[in-house]
Structures are given as structure tokens and as C-alpha cells.
Amino acid sequence: GEVWWSQGYSEPGSGSDLASVKTRAERQGNKYIVNGQKTWTTLGQYGEWIFCLVRTSTEGKPQTGISFLLIDMKSKGVTVRPIIMLDGGHEVNEVFFDNVEVPAENLIGEENKGWTYAKHLLSHERTNIADVNRSKRELERLKRIAKREGVWEDLSLIHISEPTRPLYI
């Protein structure tokens, strides 16, 4: 089956400054204790896991104290709260971590190297966003052609999954 992942990068008041991450992960033996908040977590209400940037050190430059953790969204202390948009829709969420225990084996790579991993992932994400915009333009072009050719109504029979429906309508 499918596993839904959420991205835990953005935090309240941080804007696009990922180096200002405040969500803390303190190592205690073979686990981390995570406290903090993420925001604008797209489709987090469906997430089974969240990959998070967390602060594991305050020494040195802000970028050097960030780690990358995988957190089970069903863990005790994880709360997902919807952010209702102006149109009444619910795609994004706030995610709260209150003394969440995360096995140390869920650390990705090395402690305090999360900044490097996140930069790599974001470079691919931004490239893929360009692909989405190109796809939207192509869909609009196909809609015009389908309407012109008189087959637009037939296309309404195609099943479109709920989370992606706004891209097509």
C-alpha cells in the first residue's frame, strides 16, 4: 500500500528561513525528545510519517545545529490541527510536538547535518514545482482542445483523486 509522508520544515514566524528552526530534539539515550511546532504542512491530516528539520544544537552557525528526523505521526504527543483557508478548504495544517519520543535510529544521516540534506531535497522540489506549472499549462491547453473538438463532456468521466482535483477544475 501507499504511505503518506508530510514535510516538517516551516515554522511560525520563520518564513522561508529554514536556519531559524526552533523545534527541539534532545537526545536521551537511544531516543530523541521532540518539542515544537511546524506549520503549512500540506495534507498533514493524511500523513503517516513526517520528515522534520529539528534543532539538535545551538552551538556554531544556525545551519550547523539542524538534524533530519523521521517521526511517526501516530506517536503520543503529535497533534495535527487544520488551517482553514479563506475558501473554507483544508489542505494545510499545524503540527505540534509535545515531548514526542522518536527512536534515535530515525535520524537521517548524521546529527547536525540536516541543513545539507534539506538543501539537496529542496533543489529537487523546486525543479518539480516547475514541472507542475508546465503540467497546468498543458492541461489548460488540452481543455481548450477538448472543448473545441466537442469531447470535453466525455472527459468528466475520468476519476480524479480528491487532493489533486483543484488542479483540474
Language-model regions: role of each:
Residues 1-10, 53:
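A short, Trp-centered hydrophobic/proline-enriched beta-strand micro-motif
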Residues 23-26:
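A structural signal for short hydrophobic beta-strand segments in well-ordered beta-sheet cores
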Residues 31, 35-81:
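A short core secondary-structure module
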Residues 74-101:
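Flexible, small-/acidic-enriched active-site or ligand-binding loops
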Residues 100-114:
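Long, acidic (Asp/Glu-rich), low-complexity accessory segments flanking structured domains
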Residues 120-141:
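A conserved active-site cap/scaffold subdomain adjacent to cofactor or substrate pockets
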Residues 149-152:
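Long, amphipathic alpha-helical stalk/connector segments used for oligomerization, subunit docking
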Residues 158-169:
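Single conserved hydrophobic/aromatic residue that forms the stacking wall/gate
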